[in-house]
Amino acid sequence: MTEQEKFMKAAWKLAQKAAEEGEVPVGCVVVCDGKIVGRGRNRRETKKTALGHAELEAIQKACKKLGGWRLHRCDLYVTLEPCPMCAGAIINARIKTVYYGASDQKAGSCGSLTNLFELPYNHKPELVSGLMEQECVDELQKFFKALRARKRAEKEHRKQLQSE
């Protein structure tokens, strides 16, 4: 297992924890000098906030641990391609390299829909996509399949109650 796979696996485990909590399974770690300095997982539902993204949580924790907002020596590993908000935070934090697993065709801002890292901002993180891609895709598909089944069951249950 490569060092990159080791860190992505740590992010993937956080994604699994998010799924167990009923959140979309996205996990993230920030790494500096070979050590994890920030961890985050999706918590939009739990915290009732649109800002509850894994990347934002991991970046905030890394900034606190390292004592500053410039994370230019850090890499970020995330299971799902960052959205525009998170890509902006990555640029602002000066993250060196972003590794992501699954592409996001609906909100991906690192190549799928757009690539904020290619725009003329003051910082351009390097980008590595597709790391542990299948594991990340499988986790997302499993979550959304279960969510759809649960919603169908709830709908059927409501129908039964109305017909009684």
In which residue ranges do the predicted regions lie?
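A short acidic/small-residue loop/turn micro-motif
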Residues: 44-46
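Short, basic and Ser/Thr-rich N-terminal targeting/leader segments
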Residues: 22-26, 72
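Helix-adjacent hinge/juxtasegments
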Residues: 51, 56, 60-93, 97
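Short beta-strand scaffold segments in enzyme catalytic cores
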Residues: 26-34
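Zinc-dependent deaminase
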Residues: 1-21, 85, 89-164
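Short secondary-structure boundary/capping segments
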Residues: 28, 67-68, 117-119
